[in-house]
Amino acid sequence: ENVQDKIPNNFFDVIFAFHVIEHIQDPIAFIKQLNKKIKIGGMLIIATPDFDCAMARKYKDKFRLLHDPTHISLFSNDSLTSLINENGFKIDKKDFPYFESKWFTEDNLLKVFEDDIVSPPFYGNVMTFYCIKELDLN
C-alpha cells in the first residue's frame, strides 16, 4: 500500500509541490492525485522551472535546466496553466519570484547579454502557481 493511499481524500487545506512535477513521469496522474487529497476550496502551491522563459528561448539547447536528466516533464506557463485548469483547480495567482529576489541586480541582468556557453542561473526561470481547488475529481 502506498503512503498516499493511507491519507483520506479531501484531507489537506494546502499542498506544496515545489520543484516536484518536473521529475514526475505522469504529471496528469500526479495533479489528479493532489486534487483527491485537497479539500474543496483548499490550495495547491506548485513551483517548477519555466522551460519557455526568456532564458530558455535565448539559450535554446544550452539552457541550463535542460541538462538535468531528472527533468522529465517540462512545462511552460501555458502548459502548466492548462494542466491545472483541466484538473479541477482555478489559478488564483502566478508568481515569477526571481524578479523579487536578491539576485535580480543590474550586474546579473547584464550577464544575460553575454554569450556564455550555457545560460546563467535564475533569470526568471521559475514559476509558482497558487491554485484553488474548485472541482472534486473523485
Residue ranges: model-predicted function:
Residues N9, F104-D107:
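Short secondary-structure transition/capping segments
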Residues N138:
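ATP/Mg2+ or Mg2+-diphosphate-binding catalytic cores
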Residues P97-W103:
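Conserved PLP cofactor-binding pocket of PLP-dependent enzymes
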